[in-house]
A protein has these predicted regions:
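Cytosolic regulatory regions of ion transport systems
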Residues: 1-103
């Protein structure tokens, strides 16, 4: 089974994670907002409250060496950039880091 991480559970990230879970994809969902993580946990098993800018935190929840990671942090461009940088440092084998921000 393919595993995809979704970082950021705003409108876009929430629906991407939910849709992927319906396609028999293992989803690891991450956000720093407890309410958003609780909402998505109704649809997927691996949902975590995490500071996505922390390499150590991402590694602890299993976000390393994945083929695809989707970053959907929204309007906080700094957090989005720092998250992508942490992923690049952490995931030497990651083939796709998809980023969706609103600027």
């Amino acid at each position: 089974m393919k595993t995809i991480a979704v970082i950021g559970l705003g409108k876009f990230g929430f629906y991407v994670a939910k849709s992927l879970s319906r396609l028999d994809v293992k989803v690891i969902a991450v956000d720093n907002d407890e309410k958003k993580v609780h909402e998505i946990s109704e649809f997927i098993d691996d949902a975590y409250i995490v500071d996505s800018m922390s390499k150590q935190a991402l590694q602890e929840v299993g976000i390393y060496n994945l083929d695809t990671v989707i970053v959907s942090i929204g309007e906080n461009i700094e957090a989005s950039i720092l998250t992508v940088m942490a992923l690049k440092d952490l995931n030497n084998n990651t083939k796709n880091i998809l980023e969706n921000s609103q600027v």
